[in-house]
Amino acid sequence: MGSAYKMLKNDKRCVRKHSKTIFLELFSISSSSSTQDKILQEIENLNADPFVHGIIVQMPLDSHEGIEINSHLVTNRIDPDKDVDSLTTINQGKVATGVLNSFIPCTPAGCLDLIKQSGVKLEGANAVVIGRSKIVGTPVTQLLKWNDATVTTCHSKTQNLKGIVSQADILVVAIGQPQFIPGSWIKTGAVVIDAGINFIPDSYKKSGK
């Protein structure tokens, strides 16, 4: 059984997992050189293509000639039945209300799997999520909540962050800032996941980071 997924990149791949083969066709629609209308039209074409089963828009979207592209409008144009990243309002609403038998955002789902594999008991656990983006922070909070953890979401306006973090049985950091949480804040035995994308100095890499 095969499934086809399309992403806004330039590549073609075939991924085999268990007994299924997933064909990935990645192609480029550069948001820095394409208008918003062109991107929306391409998504409509993919929505109508019966051979495409999933669509992922690679974020963030760049501006075009100084005009910002509305990422919410773009992602919300995807057919919810093909929205494998769960970025449409409909699919986000399902996750928010505990309807988890549809698409779950990949990174939040991966965080939940890692937490379960750690052996920590989710029911009643004190979970702290730092970050509230719709891509990671918010859906992680919702998934933990629907798995019966007691969840606190922290952000840039949160007071007494150290005190909150120090009580966490589970800590998920979903912000783009490295070394934001000192190790001294984290209690012994806590499960910690850094889901942020951070660039830090690395002398072993050609790029230096």
Regions found by a protein language model. Name each.
Residues 38-50:
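Short, well-structured alpha-helical segments in soluble
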Residues 2-17, 93, 99-195, 200-209:
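Glycine-rich phosphate/diphosphate-binding loop of Rossmann-like nucleotide-binding domains
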Residues 53-126:
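Anion-binding alpha/beta catalytic cores of soluble intermediary-metabolism enzymes, centered on
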Residues 24-37, 156-158:
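Short beta->alpha junction loops
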Residues 51-52, 168:
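Short, high-confidence coil segments that cap the C-terminus of an alpha-helix
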Residues 7-8, 15, 21-22, 26-29, ...:
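Cationic, amphipathic, low-complexity alpha-helical segments enriched
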Residues 1, 29, 57-59:
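Short glycine-centered, acidic/aromatic-flanked micro-motifs in structured strand/loop junctions
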Residues 3-6, 32-34, 62-65, 199:
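Short, small-residue-enriched loops and turns at beta-alpha junctions
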